[in-house]
């Protein structure tokens, strides 16, 4: 663990806090948890708890909240745990300070709305040849913070780097598998948020458990078709960062994407649902995911139905009826 003595987690949310605690527990001597909110930093420093985002979980003694982005200059490892649409701005702020050999683990899931770039592409666009890895998989911050068994995937094009980075976050209850299939891991993490909105809508509309299971299975087929168009490994999509994350996100009220869809299914307006739930990554990813699918000639009817609802081209009931009216076909057609 001596290799990762100084770690910086960019993002003071629940997931950033949980990962910062893991890094401290894994042996890092100094873990800086950065957020731009000075009042939030003062609260965490005074109480030893991130009461706003992860209440009831003590901060490790090696963890120090800060608003100073200059801490990245001395870091051995950076965890980027900010919303996907904010990643570029944060990386631009640290670009001149970040030492070139310092690895960056991207812990956000999505596609940049304005450019259609995946998170690793955003990092490359801003930072050039900085070593980058991606962390994704079925995980809720509270589960990890409370020591509940969780398994995730860490991907880097450099397989040796991926294997080495595992030790920075490993814990008896937090198991990391590594891979070189960065794009496959990113696709799973981005697409599942959109599909979870569909499952939430179905649950909110009280369509039943059978409909929910069908949406997961057919959503996974869409995920696989999309991934194949990008040349990713099917085993990655069938693993933790693909199917695993899809199942978790599509079946739990802890998921903001699922909860957002559930609210829409209950008749809540899009604006009210967003205001009540907070950041919904799938809301921002949906349009660009479908744009990429259309550009690649990939059929994604569930994702397209969600897009139509979010763009207010269709109501919830019309979108459901449209999916149910699709012609019957062989189950594995196009899979």
UniProtKB/Swiss-Prot annotation:
Lipid biosynthesis listed as a keyword: yes
- Pathway(s) per entry: Membrane lipid metabolism; glycerophospholipid metabolism
- Alphabetical list of InterPro entries matching this protein: 6-PGluconate_DH-like_C_sf, 6PGD_dom2, G3P_DH_NAD-dep, G3P_DH_NAD-dep_C, G3P_DH_NAD-dep_N, NAD(P)-bd_dom_sf
Give the main location: cytoplasm
Q: Name one GO cellular component term.
A: cytosol
Q: Which Pfam families does this one have? A: NAD_Gly3P_dh_C, NAD_Gly3P_dh_N
Organism superkingdom = Bacteria
Q: Which UniProt keywords apply?
A: Cytoplasm, Lipid biosynthesis, Lipid metabolism, NAD, NADP, Nucleotide-binding, Oxidoreductase, Phospholipid biosynthesis, Phospholipid metabolism
The residues that the entry says bind NADPH are: 15, 36, 109, 141, 256, 279, 281
Q: GO: which molecular function terms?
A: glycerol-3-phosphate dehydrogenase [NAD(P)+] activity; NAD binding
Q: Which SUPFAM superfamilies match?
A: 6-phosphogluconate dehydrogenase C-terminal domain-like, NAD(P)-binding Rossmann-fold domains
Q: What class of enzyme is it?
A: oxidoreductase
Q: Which residues bind sn-glycerol 3-phosphate?
A: 109, 137, 139, 192, 245, 255-257
EC number from the UniProt entry? 1.1.1.94
Quote the catalytic activity from the record.
Answer: sn-glycerol 3-phosphate + NAD(+) = dihydroxyacetone phosphate + NADH + H(+); sn-glycerol 3-phosphate + NADP(+) = dihydroxyacetone phosphate + NADPH + H(+)
Residues of the active site are 192 (proton acceptor)
The protein's location, in the record's own words, is:
Cytoplasm
**Single GO BP term:** glycerol-3-phosphate catabolic process
HAMAP family, alphabetically? NAD_Glyc3P_dehydrog
- Family listed: Belongs to the NAD-dependent glycerol-3-phosphate dehydrogenase family.
UniProt xrefs under PANTHER family: GLYCEROL-3-PHOSPHATE DEHYDROGENASE (PTHR11728), GLYCEROL-3-PHOSPHATE DEHYDROGENASE [NAD(+)] 2, CHLOROPLASTIC (PTHR11728:SF1)
Q: What does this protein do?
A: Catalyzes the reduction of the glycolytic intermediate dihydroxyacetone phosphate (DHAP) to sn-glycerol 3-phosphate (G3P), the key precursor for phospholipid synthesis.
Protein name in the entry: Glycerol-3-phosphate dehydrogenase [NAD(P)+]
């Amino acid at each position: 663990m001596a290799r990762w003595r100084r770690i910086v987690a960019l993002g003071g949310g629940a997931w950033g806090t949980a990962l910062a605690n893991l890094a401290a527990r894994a042996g890092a001597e100094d873990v800086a948890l950065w957020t731009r909110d000075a009042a939030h930093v003062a609260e965490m420093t005074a109480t030893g708890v991130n009461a706003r985002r992860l209440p009831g979980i003590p901060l490790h003694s090696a963890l120090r909240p800060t608003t100073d982005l200059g801490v990245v200059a001395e870091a051995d490892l950076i965890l980027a745990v900010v919303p996907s649409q904010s990643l570029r701005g944060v990386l631009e702020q640290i670009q001149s300070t970040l030492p070139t050999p310092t690895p960056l683990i991207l812990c956000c899931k999505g596609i940049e709305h304005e450019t259609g770039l995946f998170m690793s592409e955003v990092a490359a666009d801003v930072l050039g040849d900085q070593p980058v890895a991606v962390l994704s998989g079925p995980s809720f911050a509270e589960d990890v913070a409370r020591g509940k068994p969780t398994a995730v995937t860490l991907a880097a094009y450099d397989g040796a780097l991926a294997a080495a980075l595992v030790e920075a976050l490993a814990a008896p209850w937090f198991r990391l598998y590594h891979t070189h299939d960065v794009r496959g891991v990113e696709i799973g993490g981005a697409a599942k948020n959109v599909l979870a909105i569909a499952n939430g809508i179905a649950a909110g509309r009280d369509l039943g458990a059978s409909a929910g299971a069908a949406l997961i299975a057919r959503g996974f087929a869409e995920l696989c078709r999309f991934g194949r168009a990008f040349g990713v490994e099917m085993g990655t999509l069938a693993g933790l960062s693909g199917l695993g994350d899809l199942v978790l996100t599509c079946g739990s009220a802890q998921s903001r994407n699922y909860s957002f869809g559930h609210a829409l299914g209950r008749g809540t307006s899009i604006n009210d649902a967003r205001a009540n739930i907070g950041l919904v990554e799938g809301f921002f990813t949906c349009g660009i995911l479908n744009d990429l699918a259309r550009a690649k000639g990939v059929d994604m009817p569930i994702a397209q139905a969600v897009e139509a609802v979010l763009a207010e081209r269709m109501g919830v009931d019309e979108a459901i009826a449209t999916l149910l009216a699709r012609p019957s076909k062989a189950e594995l057609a196009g899979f």
